[in-house]
């Protein structure tokens, strides 16, 4: 009879515990790994690359007003050597300098060349205004075979002033120009250093020559330095060009007595543009905002590893070739051993017998969402994704890449290393500064991505916990947690019942009576098993006590009858 009761109780126990619902997250082995603040190489379900490495080997100019200077150097557009005749005035938002471009025809150099080049690169083009200078008693048609058009000529925007006749003394002159425009005027002039003293005397007469230039913010005097130099373009002389930015309503004055290359027109800059040095081919079929010497970087990523001197709206240059940004949860798929154990235990304990906790392992095949449910009941087994928790996590993760871009993108200007002798030290400082910035940003990039990855993984774990708590609050005393991410339900729960748990519409009062009855049956079975253990221990103790009492009684009788003697020695 006792055996029959035990069998019935056990059958009831198994029946009650047959219905089960488990929570888990998607997992599928894909080898996608990210680094966080505390760990390296954590596998995640989804991740995106943040470092661009793909280069377009062309200058993408679609939608841009582009000017290709070809053989003309950018500074040549201000002074006008023959190769720049078509670019003396222009409007553009993308200026391309070529390696073959040349700024000058007669040998010489520009003072503070790189600063002037940067100003012109950022301008949206050039427009010019005649300065109105007139001259008497001198020639204004100086020319040279170094600047050939159909014959010997000179810079289109400059006047080479010479004495009326050879060896005649050049008269002292003063010329002034007032900027009446609302924007600054770029004023440029030159100093001619003859190839010899004799040549200087022939061109400008005898005596020392002095040129003085001044405005409200500028004053400097120049003296030519005649002497032999290596011939370039057939010339041993040199022309050095100087410049200033003249504010609106300010006046520039020139005082000179020879060896002066006079400006003919003042230059005014138009708007904004981007200037690049590149020999890459133009392509009007693609659009770009970030350029470098090798072409165009087209990317929505926050970082790039293509060229440290890219300019425009560019991703930050970093030394790392890859920085993966987690856009999904931690990925811990079931391994082969785990799968074999699951298959073996299904035969004995059902679908969920061997599933580890929902944090330790994920489920493969949960393709409709990041989080979901598996259930087992009398109608069978099923799996369903939870869209709300998945969307909540996605909403918080979406925009991480854009936020990184906002933190890192900016308009870059390119400062080349074509420095003259005086500027070489400045160039070294700029190069050192650039390298230091790259080091800092490479570290910052790695840190920013690691912080975001840490937040993503913590966030997705948090959403899993929220989902688990939602189910626990619904089921209350109608179910029991098994410690592995599952709930053993104490009542019959068909597919509609399981759906109500997933949809957060489960009514625990509806099943409360049945669940309590089944819970009592389970507790009774547990209590009977525990009582039996107590009886066994009590029986064992009573038997030992009875055996000891009998032994002591026999000993007492024997001593009393003289059959046993007990001697106590002190």
Curated annotation (Swiss-Prot):
All ranges on the Cytoplasmic side of the membrane: 555-570
Q: Where is the lipid attached (S-palmitoyl cysteine)?
A: 566, 569
User: Topologically, how does it sit relative to the membrane?
Assistant: Single-pass type I membrane protein
Q: What does this protein do?
A: Binds to sialic acid-containing receptors on the cell surface, bringing about the attachment of the virus particle to the cell. This attachment induces virion internalization of about two third of the virus particles through clathrin-dependent endocytosis and about one third through a clathrin- and caveolin-independent pathway. Plays a major role in the determination of host range restriction and virulence. Class I viral fusion protein. Binds to sialic acid-containing receptors on the cell surface, bringing about the attachment of the virus particle to the cell. This attachment induces virion internalization either through clathrin-dependent endocytosis or through clathrin- and caveolin-independent pathway. Plays a major role in the determination of host range restriction and virulence. Class I viral fusion protein. Responsible for penetration of the virus into the cell cytoplasm by mediating the fusion of the membrane of the endocytosed virus particle with the endosomal membrane.
Q: List the gene name.
A: HA
- Carbohydrate attachment residues: 30, 46, 249, 253, 335, 431, 503
Annotated protein name in UniProt: Hemagglutinin
**PTM per Swiss-Prot/TrEMBL:** Palmitoylated.
Gene3D superfamilies according to UniProt: 3.90.20.10, 3.90.209.20
Q: Which organism is it from?
A: Influenza A virus (strain A/Equine/C.Detroit/1/1964 H7N7)
């Amino acid at each position: 009879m006792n055996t029959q009761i035990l069998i019935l109780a056990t059958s009831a126990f198994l029946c009650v515990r047959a219905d089960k619902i488990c929570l888990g997250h998607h997992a599928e082995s894909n080898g996608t790994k990210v680094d966080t603040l505390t760990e390296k190489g954590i596998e995640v379900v989804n991740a995106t690359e943040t470092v661009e490495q793909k280069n377009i080997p062309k200058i993408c100019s679609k939608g841009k007003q582009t000017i290709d200077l070809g053989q003309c150097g950018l500074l040549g557009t201000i002074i006008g050597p023959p190769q720049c005749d078509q670019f003396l005035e222009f409007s553009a938002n993308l200026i391309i300098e070529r390696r073959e471009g040349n700024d000058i025809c007669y040998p010489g150099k520009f003072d503070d060349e790189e600063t002037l080049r940067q100003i012109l690169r950022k301008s949206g083009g050039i427009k010019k205004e005649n300065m109105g200078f007139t001259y008497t008693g001198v020639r204004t048609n100086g020319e040279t075979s170094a600047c050939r058009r159909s014959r010997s000529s000179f810079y289109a925007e400059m006047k080479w002033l010479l004495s009326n006749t050879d060896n005649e003394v050049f008269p002292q002159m003063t010329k002034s120009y007032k900027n009446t425009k609302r924007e600054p005027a770029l004023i440029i002039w030159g100093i001619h250093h003859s190839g010899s003293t004799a040549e200087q005397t022939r061109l400008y007469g005898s005596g020392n020559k002095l040129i003085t230039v001044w405005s409200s913010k500028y004053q400097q005097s120049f003296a030519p330095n005649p002497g032999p130099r290596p011939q370039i373009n057939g010339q041993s002389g040199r022309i050095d060009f100087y410049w200033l930015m003249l504010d609106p309503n300010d006046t520039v004055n020139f005082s000179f007595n020879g060896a002066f290359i006079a400006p003919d027109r003042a230059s005014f800059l138009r708007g904004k543009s981007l200037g690049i040095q590149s020999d890459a081919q133009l392509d009007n079929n693609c659009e770009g905002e970030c350029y470098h010497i090798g072409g165009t970087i087209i990317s929505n990523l926050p970082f790039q590893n293509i060229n440290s001197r890219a300019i425009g709206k560019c991703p930050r240059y970093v030394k790392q070739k890859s920085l993966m940004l987690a856009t999904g949860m931690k990925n811990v798929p079931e391994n082969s051993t785990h799968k074999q154990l699951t298959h073996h235990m299904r035969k004995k304990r059902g679908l969920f017998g061997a599933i580890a906790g929902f944090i330790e392992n994920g489920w493969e095949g949960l393709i409709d969402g990041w989080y979901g449910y598996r259930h087992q009941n009398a109608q069978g087994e099923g799996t369903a994704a939870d869209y709300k928790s998945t969307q909540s996590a996605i909403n918080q993760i979406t925009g991480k890449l854009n936020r990184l871009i906002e933190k890192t993108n900016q308009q870059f200007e390119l400062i080349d290393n074509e420095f003259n002798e005086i500027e070489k030290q400045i160039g070294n400082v700029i190069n050192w500064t650039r390298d230091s910035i790259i080091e800092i940003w490479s570290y910052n990039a790695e840190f920013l991505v690691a912080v975001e990855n840490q937040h993503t993984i913590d966030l997705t774990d948090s959403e899993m916990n929220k989902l688990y708590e939602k189910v626990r609050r619904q089921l209350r005393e109608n179910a029991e947690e098994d410690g592995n991410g599952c709930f053993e339900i104490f009542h019959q729960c068909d597919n509609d019942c399981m759906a109500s748990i997933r949809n957060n519409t489960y009514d625990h009062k509806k099943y409360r009576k049945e669940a309590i009855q089944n819970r009592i049956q389970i507790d009774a079975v547990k209590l009977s098993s525990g009582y039996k253990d107590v009886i066994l221990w009590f029986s064992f103790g009573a038997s030992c006590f009875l055996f000891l009492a009998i032994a002591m009684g026999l000993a007492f009788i024997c001593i009393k009858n003289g059959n046993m003697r007990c001697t106590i020695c002190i």
